[in-house]
């Protein structure tokens, strides 16, 4: 601690910062965002933003729902936490490698390769969820290792994509406003992974078919009160929505899933992801890699404050 305090004090009083360029020192907040607005009008920047907005649709169901389905099928939350713990050192190692791979003429290649891997892993995740042992069977060691391996590989591909695209942002960002430039692109990238999630969750509910089954000996009056009829042999309504689950729980019933919308939704997402990759994202990325770094910037002329 003493050495840290000494070093910090030395930096505070004796270290001098490198002189700023006149363009950086004279640009205020208004000027920076004025430049950013002009940058957003560049055709290749608009294409990059468009790619960010659609790129994560393909594996959105896998990211948002697979973990929930594994827990729903009997995997303990502590087991998922173990997967995260195992995954952490791999993220550090492969994140560094991804940054190394993202240099040169084909800076987006690691991002594209990881894109394909995530689509494949989304299909693998569906197979893992489908093959989960049904209660009262327990999850065996081999199957548990398979789940952990799939989780680590998914996280690895996600890390490669994140680091790869961040490295590309670093290459194209204007050094004068690099922080603002990269914040804008990273915000758009995060938004691309956020906006589809609502629709994915709604699709899972929409495609799911389930019914409530009354327990043996349930009171006729209770059925009449909750469901409007007293015949326990008839379907007691859907059991997918929160309201349906609540009605079923009021009589002590059980929800039976006839068709899980997770598989339909994830399949639709993978098909959309593969189609957009082949016909939209890949051609755009190839063209963006050919854009020279100066073309991602705009002239600072006109943003300097007037001097008297």
Language model: regions and residue ranges:
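A membrane-interface helix-boundary motif in multi-pass transporters
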Residues: 1, 109, 202-275
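C-terminal membrane-cytosol helix-exit motif in multi-pass small-molecule transporters
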Residues: 3-20, 277-284
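Juxtamembrane intracellular "pre-TM" segments in multi-pass secondary transporters
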Residues: 17-47, 298-308
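Pair of pore-lining "gating" transmembrane helices in MFS-fold secondary transporters
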Residues: 40-65, 152, 156
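Loop-to-transmembrane helix entry
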Residues: 46-49, 66-90, 111, 145-146, ...
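Loop-to-transmembrane helix entry/capping segments in MFS-fold secondary transporters
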Residues: 77-78, 144-145, 175-186
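Helix-to-loop junctions at the C-terminal end of transmembrane segments
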Residues: 91-113, 204
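C-terminal ends and interior cores of transmembrane alpha-helices
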Residues: 116-140
């Amino acid at each position: 601690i003493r050495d840290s305090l000494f070093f910090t004090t030395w930096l505070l009083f004796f270290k001098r910062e490198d002189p700023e360029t006149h363009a950086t020192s004279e640009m205020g907040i208004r000027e920076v965002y004025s430049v950013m607005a002009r940058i957003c009008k560049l055709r290749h920047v608009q294409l990059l933003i468009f790619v960010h907005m659609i790129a994560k649709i393909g594996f959105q169901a896998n990211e948002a729902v697979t973990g929930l389905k594994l827990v729903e099928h009997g995997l303990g939350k502590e087991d998922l936490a173990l997967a995260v713990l195992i995954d952490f050192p791999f993220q550090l190692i492969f994140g560094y490698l991804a940054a190394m791979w993202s240099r040169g003429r084909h800076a987006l290649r690691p991002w594209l390769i990881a894109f394909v891997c995530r689509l494949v892993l989304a299909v693998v995740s569906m197979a893992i969820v489908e093959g989960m042992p049904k209660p009262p069977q327990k999850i065996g060691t081999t199957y548990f290792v398979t789940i952990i391996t799939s989780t680590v590989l998914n996280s690895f591909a996600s890390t490669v994509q994140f680091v790869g695209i961040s490295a590309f942002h670093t290459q194209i960002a204007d050094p004068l406003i690099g922080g603002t430039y990269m914040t804008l692109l990273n915000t758009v990238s995060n938004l691309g992974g956020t906006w589809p999630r609502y629709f994915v969750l709604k699709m899972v509910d929409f495609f799911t078919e389930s019914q409530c089954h009354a327990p043996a000996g349930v009171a006729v009056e209770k059925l009449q009160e909750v469901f409007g009829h007293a015949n326990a042999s008839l379907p007691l309504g859907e059991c997918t929505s929160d309201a349906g689950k609540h009605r079923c729980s009021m009589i002590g019933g059980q929800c039976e899933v006839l068709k899980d919308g997770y598989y339909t939704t994830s399949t639709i997402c993978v098909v959309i992801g593969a189609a957009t990759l082949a016909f939209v994202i890949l051609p755009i990325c190839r063209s963006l890699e050919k854009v020279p770094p100066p073309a991602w910037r705009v002239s600072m002329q006109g943003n300097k404050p007037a001097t008297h």
